[in-house]
């Protein structure tokens, strides 16, 4: 009988070499970016983490809480569209933070999506894609690579819905990588690299599914 393998170990020991390489890099605390000089591994001294609940520090203004009801969340329903939105390639996606996502990295994300490591989290208004988050799920850690919105508050709604979804699924960590003023309004906070790696190790040991 095969031994049960926690989700993170599934990718760290994956038969596909690329999936295994990427999983090992993220499990070690690094992340991929292309800042115009080729694809490289990066790390930052202060890692931005999103609280998963309001009790843990997630800030959801009363008006935003009311607006959330108008955004319908989903997982992996529009992966290619979310990548395009993050790159600013979708009509009406003014806010994006994925200009660093090169064509090569798009191909990697698409490959990782087929092996189950890369995911999209979307929010919709009716049949219209309002915003989304692109990321990797490894054990109980979700590493958010990029986000975008097409409708007002779309990226904010996506991140809040994602945090609450991860909490329900038993995840322990939502990593936003790099802090910015927009994230700070949601209660996103920074931890040192040493603390991040400690939290990441604990999250990787969890056997949860997105």
Curated annotation (Swiss-Prot):
Principal localisation: cytoplasm
Record HAMAP family: Leu_Phe_trans
Gene3D superfamilies, sorted: Leucyl/phenylalanyl-tRNA-protein transferase, C-terminal domain
Source organism superkingdom: Bacteria
Disulfide bonds, paired cysteine numbers: none
Biological process annotations from GO: protein catabolic process
Protein name: Leucyl/phenylalanyl-tRNA--protein transferase
Catalytic activity: N-terminal L-lysyl-[protein] + L-leucyl-tRNA(Leu) = N-terminal L-leucyl-L-lysyl-[protein] + tRNA(Leu) + H(+); N-terminal L-arginyl-[protein] + L-leucyl-tRNA(Leu) = N-terminal L-leucyl-L-arginyl-[protein] + tRNA(Leu) + H(+); L-phenylalanyl-tRNA(Phe) + an N-terminal L-alpha-aminoacyl-[protein] = an N-terminal L-phenylalanyl-L-alpha-aminoacyl-[protein] + tRNA(Phe)
Species for this entry: Deinococcus radiodurans (strain ATCC 13939 / DSM 20539 / JCM 16871 / CCUG 27074 / LMG 4051 / NBRC 15346 / NCIMB 9279 / VKM B-1422 / R1)
InterPro entries: Acyl_CoA_acyltransferase, Leu/Phe-tRNA_Trfase, Leu/Phe-tRNA_Trfase_C
Enzyme class, UniProt record, top EC level: transferase
GO molecular function, one term: leucyl-tRNA--protein transferase activity
Keywords: Acyltransferase, Cytoplasm, Transferase
EC numbers for this chain: 2.3.2.6
Protein task: Functions in the N-end rule pathway of protein degradation where it conjugates Leu, Phe and, less efficiently, Met from aminoacyl-tRNAs to the N-termini of proteins containing an N-terminal arginine or lysine.
NCBIfam families: aat
